[in-house]
């Protein structure tokens, strides 16, 4: 084995290095500590690392402290009161178990669901469909309105997958069913924490969605989606595909690297041929080059490469199906003691039977929706051109009856902490006073054109930051066919529908001058649809006592830059362009120590105003403001109260 050579660490003594490293100070301290230790007669005069770290950082020295023994486990609790059905309230009592309680997660299983059987319509009939839209099964020879003659039009019925259905058949089809996006978030309409009949904190489903948009890190989003019932896409790939490599360094030539470096005819520089040959070797796609001389080689004027296409698909609760299997949901609670173990509540400080979690559940219609199970197929041939035919589809969407969805396994998992009796007694005997952060929410309706201003009367106490969004009323309207997709989005959602029409041409010209005129086209039954969220706030302002804190800032500054700059890893920039953040703290959500606030209990003239081109008397919206408010929790005499109530 070879021995290692001598290693020499060279320390620069420039002006910047003297400030950053302070090598003279380090040497002086080591010498002084040695002299002091020798004067005390210590057998080992060398300084300790802790003494060195008083003035210098030692990156390779780890530290630890002994810690108070602690253990924890989750305890399942059933509802204390309330019928476990959708649309009702459930109240969970927090039992006297363990020394502290911290994390909480609700567990529910939504039963299987499906829509009812329906009769296939008779040709020529019309019926009022879902969302107030008239559904028509036209007669042959007429257009979609069943009134305008259209020669060559023939109509049949098919299911969403193109399989034929006989008109007039009893119990011939049924609609597909699917869940709303993030059903676990929407299931909890309101969550409240009460002690001795006093509400200490509460939040709505809007708060939960804003927390997800701003605070769930990307590397945990897949797990979060699994918990709240949101489908996760699966990646698929194609087989190997041959593609051409174009280097545009030399204009108008697809393979400039074939030019010899000594070619005097070239008019501009080009990529070195050895460089591209290393990245796209010919033997990766040419069998003859690889050693099979009996196979005809592939020849091309450009370099070639072999690649695959990547596509995504999903089959979760949001994918329409004839039968949706039972759906298990795990919903984390968002109170201050759930988020930070340092703020776990001493269980012994509040008597059993006086602390409750109350949850208002959403109704079934908010969670599950139908998708058309029947389509009208128009097949039209062009008179005089029997080889030319166009095929189009329109949905026949009549609401069915979805079975009542059961709600089982209703449990609240409570994380209980256990400590030694000595520590337990300290918390029993002493009054505890701690800084906490609670939710303050205000939802205000608006229908003013172009500009509006709202007093934030529901906000109080010191506010560190606010999540803000203007949600169109249409997003949660029963008349919106996509409300189960749009309900959590803070902007107007439009659909970009891809219409890939498949063409087939049959050439029958008998002269070179004649162009083929027999071309058929077939549209997809369910074209690919991309939802696009359009932000509806142009500029936003915040004022307090007439003083502009934010004066007509563009919405993108609050939706993209503020969450990008502030919050460290605790805040992320949301995908929703209509979700905005305004912070009065330098480090929102980063640490327990407050770093800035505005006390709106003192600054009561606290307004938010905005400019918009969307909102009007018909296109109304709701301003949603979720604020993080500082308060103080006082635990004494078997009760928990907030220091400030107004």
Swiss-Prot record:
UniProt keyword Membrane, yes or no: yes
A Pfam family that the UniProt record links to this protein: Capsid_NCLDV
Subcellular location, record wording: Virion; Host endoplasmic reticulum membrane; Host cytoplasm, Host cytosol
InterPro entries: MCP_C, MCP_C_sf, VP_dsDNA_II
Keywords assigned by UniProt, alphabetized: Capsid protein, Host cytoplasm, Host endoplasmic reticulum, Host membrane, Host-virus interaction, Late protein, Membrane, Viral attachment to host cell, Virion, Virus entry into host cell
Disulfide links within the chain: none
Molecular-function GO terms, alphabetical: structural molecule activity
Principal location: virion
GO cellular component: a single term: host cell cytosol
Bilayer topology term: Peripheral membrane protein
Top-rank taxon: Viruses
Induction (record text): Expressed in the late phase of the viral replicative cycle.
Assembly: Homotrimer. The membrane-bound form, but not the cytosolic one, assembles into large complexes. Interacts with the minor capsid proteins M1249L and p17; these interactions form a rigid zipper structure that stabilizes the capsomers.
Family: Belongs to the NCLDV major capsid protein family.
Function: Capsid protein that self-assembles to form the pseudo-hexameric capsomers of the icosahedral capsid. The capsid is constructed of 2760 pseudo-hexameric capsomers and 12 pentameric capsomers, with a T=277 symmetry, about 200 nm in diameter. The capsid encapsulates the DNA-containing nucleoid, the core shell and the inner membrane. Plays an essential role in virion assembly. Involved in virus attachment to the host cell.
Name the record gives this protein: Hexon protein p72
Species classification: Viruses, Varidnaviria, Bamfordvirae, Nucleocytoviricota, Pokkesviricetes
